[in-house]
From Swiss-Prot:
Signal peptide: none
Keywords from the named record: Ribonucleoprotein, Ribosomal protein, RNA-binding, rRNA-binding
Cellular compartments per GO CC: ribonucleoprotein complex; ribosome
A Pfam family per the record: Ribosomal_L20
Protein name, as recorded: Large ribosomal subunit protein bL20
Keyword Phosphoprotein: no
Disulfide bonds: none
SUPFAM superfamilies from the UniProt entry: Ribosomal protein L20 (SSF74731)
Family note: Belongs to the bacterial ribosomal protein bL20 family.
CDD domains: Ribosomal_L20
Gene: rplT
HAMAP family cross-referenced by the UniProt entry: Ribosomal_bL20
Length: 118
């Protein structure tokens, strides 16, 4: 059985990993053994943070809605409850955009929520 030399495959694998590690600091972008660890960890962080991003954005939207609704004299939970009772089906992402960019419309939504709560 002939001897198998893996030079081509090894070089290709090394090149692939070092290309992924391009831009990393120091040995992480130059030394294969360190780069493998760095790229693996980066992949783990990316996987975790793709899931966290959804939570973080929802928190941001809720914070913005809360701040805007409190200016109009209504807490976030009472505002959302009022919208539900008034059968207004606008999700938090859109509510946050309205709160930031269209204050008049948001003030109208707060009034709708207040009427539904009364």
């Amino acid at each position: 059985m002939p001897r198998v030399k893996r030079g081509v495959q090894a070089r290709a694998r090394h090149k692939k990993v070092l290309k992924q590690a391009k831009g990393y600091y120091g040995a992480r972008s130059r030394v294969y053994r360190v780069a493998v660890q760095a790229v693996t960890k980066a992949g783990q962080y990316a996987y975790r943070d793709r899931r966290q991003r959804k939570r973080v954005f929802r928190q941001l939207w809720i914070t913005r809605i809360n701040a805007a609704s409190r200016i109009s004299g209504l807490s976030y939970s009472r505002f959302i409850n009022g919208l539900k009772k008034a059968s207004v089906e606008i999700d938090r992402k859109i509510l946050a955009d309205i709160a930031v960019f269209d204050k008049a419309t948001f003030a109208h939504l707060v009034e709708v929520a207040k009427k539904a709560l009364a």
